[in-house]
Each structure stands twice: as C-alpha cells, then as structure tokens.
C-alpha cells in the first residue's frame, strides 16, 4: 500500500466534492479527491441548479459557467409544475415555479447576475470533476475511505 501525502483529502467526487476540489486547486491548495466507484454519476439524480450554485461556477471561470449553461435547460423553459391524475390524465392544477411567476421574476433578476436552470447531475458532475483535475486535483477512483487518525502532525487516512 502506497503512502501519499496531500494537504486536503476530499472524499467523494459528486458536485460538492468536485466543486471543493476545483476551488482548492484554483487557489493553489494541493488536494486529492477519492471516489469509491470507478465512474461519475450515470443515473438520474439532482437537477435543479440554483443561482448561488451558478455563482460558484462563475467563480471557477466564465468558461465553466458557460459550459454549464450550454448543457442546461434555461430558466424560462422551467416555468410550471403540473399536477395531473396520471401522465395522460386530467390536469388538476398548474403552478408557476422556479422563479418564473411574474411577481418573482424581478427578484431573481436583481438578486444575481446568474440564472437558475435545470442542469442534471450527470452533466454537472463531469464538468466540475474535469475542472478540478485540469487545475491540479489528483483523483483516485475505486478508492474507499476506511478510517482516519488525527495526531499532532495531521491526519492519516486509510483508503482501500
């Protein structure tokens, strides 16, 4: 088993882990991200991306923000939650959502230079992971956290 030293160990390469890794690497902080699987998200998961998350992507660079928008459903196409008896049944009600109702559009427009959108995790996760690795994050797939011990010199983590 190899001994590897890093300033920060990030466990998980989902959106939070990969964004953390990308931001740390952007600031020159050595880090390693591990993922117990050998792949990134490949099944339906989270998909609504709020304005604050888009601001974090903008902090990573306009190229990252622009790539996210390229894969996302724009906010103005996310406007309704529809309630039906079934997929082909009678519509029971409709509610404007995701900041598209007339009374909330202005609030969203003035609160941030970014826009809420529908960006599935299957697109977001690879974008963040690619950004992190391209900026210096060391990544290890098929590595699972087992334990850690903290002492005066730091933290020793065992992965398998």
Language model regions located:
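Phosphate-binding active sites in nucleotide-utilizing proteins
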Residues: 14, 40, 133, 147-152
